[in-house]
Amino acid sequence: MKWYFKQIKIYQMEIYIKVLAISILTFCGSEIYAQKLIDINQAKKIAIANNQKIRVANLEVLKQKASINKAFDLGNTQISGELGQFNSAFFDTGLGISQSFSMPQVYKRKKSVYEHQMKTAESYLKLSETNLNQRLDEIFLEYNYLNAKQSLLRRQDSLYANYLEKSLIRWQTGESDVLEKTSAEQQRINLSRQLSLTSKMMNLVEVEFNWLLNDEKQQYAIQSDAFGIKSYSILLDSTRILRHPELVMADWEIQTARAVTLAEKSGLLPGFSAGYKNVSFRGLGPDEIVYSGTDRFSSFQVGVQLPIFRKAIHASIKSAQLQEEIQSQNYLAKKEELKTNLAQKTLIYNELMTQLDEFENRSLPNAQKIRNVSEIKFSAGEINYLDFVVLINQAINIENEYLD
């Protein structure tokens, strides 16, 4: 959070340009609607329903679900016809039909691949929803922080406005020099610039907020809540790592790779074919009977398809096994990354909680005491204005550091 205010002079112009550009694009791409105030839960529901990435992920799930029936593809049925002297010197006709098929486990394994791909797509959808909800949480946190910063700056501005008024009176009556008046004016100028910057940053956050919600008929405003961080401790629960959407998705990718390996091994199984043929016969038959063209005879065919040349099949199996190993290593790497990330954030969080307790128990009361005593001494003429400004700025810095 300190980034917004530690380098104001460097980034102020860049921020103004970004806000202006995004605002212009937003204005040009949609009509103007009255903003509707919503809370975080309402925002998540709207975003899940409208966000483009979520829509794409949903379509991917539907696509994979529709692909499951592809597993039972038997291939084309072959229908053939014969005309000519294929039985004797006479002209005969023949009709045939045949179908190739695999063993039942081949189709079962193919179905398993498509089902696992659907589960992987569902886990990606869940991950996308989680990332979207997390970004919305961050946006609300950022907005509430900026809102709290704005309130603090306004209180400080009100304080310096009062002191500027007193400084002008003191300068006009000859009780102070121009340095005191100029210093008071500059304090208000600085606060005005920070207030303007904070307002622009809040606008920028709302632009991204509405982009995530992707509602073409309504613009939304963020409902401000009390700014705080202690309620986020549940995010640091280490027992939830294995249920993290990224790990769940990585696990389904492993299972999908295993299913693909089994499906590739099905190439080593024999295939089968069955057929039926009906032909005519004319002339003297082997049974000493003379047949006309209207007499027809039937036969059945059964075949076995053996994978004699297996080099390509074994190569496909090896490739699938390597992909399985790749996904397993990806899972372990992602797990370690999440554990390390959680450990780092836990250390940072615990340190920040310690600092917050110190601020609330000691620094903030001290800041209030510094402010109260400084005001009394300044009003009584016991300290000059510059000493007063130093003390007040010290109290303000404590409040800013606590908020940051």
At which residue positions do the language-model features occur?
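Amphipathic alpha-helical coiled-coil segments
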Residues: 56-71, 128, 132-151, 169, ...
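Long amphipathic alpha-helical coiled-coil segments
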Residues: 124, 207-217, 263, 268, ...
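Short, charged, amphipathic alpha-helical segments
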Residues: 115, 178-186, 318, 385-393
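Bacterial Sec-pathway N-terminal export signals of envelope proteins
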Residues: 32-78, 101, 109, 175-179, ...
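Periplasmic alpha-helical coiled-coil/stalk elements that build and connect Gram-negative outer-membrane
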Residues: 3, 10, 131-245, 345-348, ...
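Small/polar (Gly/Ser/Thr/Ala-rich) solvent-exposed segments
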Residues: 55, 74-92, 100-129, 147, ...
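Bacterial Sec-dependent N-terminal signal peptides
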Residues: 1-41, 48
